Structures are given as structure tokens and as C-alpha cells.
């Protein structure tokens, strides 16, 4: 499968080269009086992009979508069996692949074309509106969604926005709460190493110093990342949470929500999973968040941050104390 996935990057290369060459040419011809937002160090796309450049960007991102999802070449779907959680392959269903209703055997993301459309739309909104901050995904599998986000930001010359790729890179943790979902930890197909994910970024020419891999179960890694973001005064313009479990969603929201500025977005991949939905509902209620929820692809949702709130981190610290954790895995 690794060889097949490596070859997929070639599909995107010609379009990428054309887009880059045209962009370089246009910058050389661009007059000095074009509006540039100096504080963001990026061109305002609505003012600076030519129609040809927009068309090339559109082709590049569409090509990425059908490649990263395995849609273009009808990649078979992984079907999870029962008992020993065996892996079975079945023919691709076009509708399921579009909305992220299956797991591609050859591909880089399971969120479907609609899920990637959502990332593109929200990133374009924050770019257009001048909302500062990075893209962060917590729970990345093979890295495809984060790769696509990086590609979108690159295509708009967003050179100052980081991409944070957060995962254990060894699958989901066993649940420590009796009402949480524990079977995820038994699914070996969810365990993809950091080296493999990093390699995927490299194959698509998306790996640079602005991409950061944060490894570890969220309860151990995200409190440390929280400290790092505070020290660096980083913001998160788009936060994508894909934790599947009650505990994981609480880890993500309590450690990272405070960094999303007004106008930024929270994407919840697992709105269709009851325990994950419960965590999000409790977090929103606890912090009196009334922002409108926008469902999409049947199982996910997002909302836009409308006001800054102090996160009740002391509650989270007490919650962590109730969990059976491995002190040796503590990172900070």
C-alpha cells in the first residue's frame, strides 16, 4: 500500500508545478502598489489573484481532494469486522466516499471530499477576514486532512500560519472512564506512525519548518502544547478535533479552545458519536457557548467563535485526576 500511495503523489505534481510557476510569474509582474497586509505578511487573495491563478488553485485543490480520499481511483474501503476486529476490503461506494462514510484502503484521509471542502471553506474564511492563527488537527490518522489544510494555506501564500499535527501515532488509548468508548484502542488500522505521516507530507511537497508533529495521547501531550502555544503567543484559526472519545474531546477542548480567536472555527469530526457529542455539549454548556452549530456530512459539525471566554481549566485538572493514567508518559 505504501508504494501505491507514493505513486498517488505524482497525480498532483503536474498541477502543483503549474500553479507554482504561474504564481511566481505573476509575482514578478505584480506592480508594487498592490495591497498587501503587512501585519499578516500575506497577499489579500480577493485583490491580488488573477482569474487564471484562481482556476489553477481550484484545479490543484480538487486534484488533492480526489487523491487524498482515494476517490479518483476507486480505492476499496476498509470494513471493520467484529470480535478480533479483522480488516475486510469492499468496493468503494461513491456517496460514502464523498461524505467520508468509509475508510479508504489506499488514501490519506477518511473524512471524504465533503470534509475537505469544509476545511477549505473555513480556512478561506479566516484568510479573507484576516483572522490570525494556525491550523491544528487533533487525531490525524494518515495525515490527509492536515496535509490538505497545509496545501490550502500554501496556495494562498499563508507563510506565517503553522500546521499542528497532533496524534499518538499508535492508535487510540484505552478508555479510563466506564461510560467511554474502549473498542477504538483495539483497531490496529488506526495506528499510523509519525514517520509514515511525515513521509506523506514530504511526498506531496508539504513538509517544511511550519509543520509540527505533536506525539502522544492527548491527556499527556496537549497540556504541554498548551504551554508552548502560550509561550509563543500562537493562535489557532481553525481547530479540528477528531478524538472519537469523551476523554479525548475534553482533552482537546480544555487545552486548545482558549487559543482560537474571535472569528476562528472549531470543527468536531465526531458529532455523530454519542460520547464525543456529550463531551462537546458539556463543554459548551459549562462555558455558556451559544454559537450556532453547523452540521455537515451527517456526522460532523462546526461553529465559529463569537466571543472570548476564560476556559475553566481547574475543572479539567480535577477531571484528569479521576482517570487512571501512566505517570511515566507525562510529558511536562
PLM regions with names:
Residues 118-129:
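Conserved alpha-helix/loop element of class I SAM-dependent methyltransferases that forms part
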Residues 3, 43-46, 330:
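Intrinsically disordered, low-complexity regions enriched in polar/acidic and amide residues
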Residues 84-89:
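Long intrinsically disordered, low-complexity regions that are acidic and Ser/Thr-rich
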Amino acid at each position: 500500500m505504501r508504494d501505491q500511495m507514493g505513486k498517488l503523489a505524482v497525480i498532483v505534481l503536474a498541477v502543483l508545478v503549474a500553479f507554482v510557476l504561474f504564481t511566481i510569474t505573476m509575482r514578478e509582474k505584480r506592480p508594487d502598489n498592490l495591497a498587501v497586509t503587512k501585519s499578516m505578511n500575506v497577499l489579500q487573495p480577493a485583490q491580488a489573484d488573477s482569474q487564471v491563478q484562481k482556476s489553477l488553485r481550484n484545479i490543484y485543490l480538487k486534484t488533492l481532494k480526489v487523491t487524498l480520499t482515494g476517490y479518483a481511483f476507486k480505492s476499496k474501503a476498509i470494513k471493520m469486522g467484529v470480535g478480533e476486529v479483522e480488516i475486510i476490503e469492499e468496493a468503494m461506494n461513491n456517496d460514502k466516499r464523498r461524505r467520508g462514510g468509509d475508510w479508504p484502503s489506499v488514501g490519506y484521509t477518511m473524512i471524504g471530499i465533503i470534509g475537505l471542502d469544509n476545511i477549505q471553506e473555513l480556512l478561506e474564511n479566516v484568510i479573507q477576514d484576516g483572522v490570525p492563527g494556525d491550523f491544528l488537527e487533533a487525531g490525524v490518522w494518515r495525515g490527509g486532512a492536515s496535509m490538505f489544510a497545509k496545501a490550502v494555506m500554501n496556495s494562498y501564500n499563508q507563510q506565517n500560519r503553522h500546521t499542528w499535527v497532533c496524534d499518538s501515532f499508535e492508535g487510540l488509548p484505552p478508555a479510563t472512564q466506564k461510560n467511554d468508548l474502549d473498542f477504538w484502542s483495539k483497531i490496529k488500522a488506526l495506528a499510523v506512525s509519525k514517520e509514515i505521516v511525515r513521509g506523506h507530507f514530504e511526498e506531496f511537497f508539504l513538509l517544511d519548518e511550519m509543520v509540527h508533529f505533536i506525539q502522544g495521547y492527548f491527556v499527556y501531550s496537549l497540556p504541554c502544547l498548551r504551554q508552548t502555544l502560550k509561550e509563543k503567543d500562537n493562535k489557532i484559526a481553525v481547530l479540528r478535533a477528531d478524538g472519537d472519545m469523551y476523554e479525548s474531546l475534553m482533552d482537546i477542548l480544555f487545552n486548545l479552545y482558549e487559543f482560537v480567536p474571535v472569528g476562528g472555527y472549531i470543527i468536531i469530526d465526531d458529532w455523530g458519536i454519542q460520547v464525543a457529542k456529550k463531551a462537546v455539549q458539556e463543554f459548551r454548556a459549562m462555558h455558556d457557548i451559544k454559537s450556532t452549530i453547523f452540521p455537515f456530512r451527517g456526522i460532523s459539525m462546526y461553529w465559529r467563535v463569537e466571543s472570548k471566554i476564560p476556559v475553566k481549566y481547574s475543572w479539567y485538572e480535577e477531571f484528569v485526576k479521576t482517570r487512571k493514567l501512566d505517570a511515566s508518559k507525562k510529558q511536562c
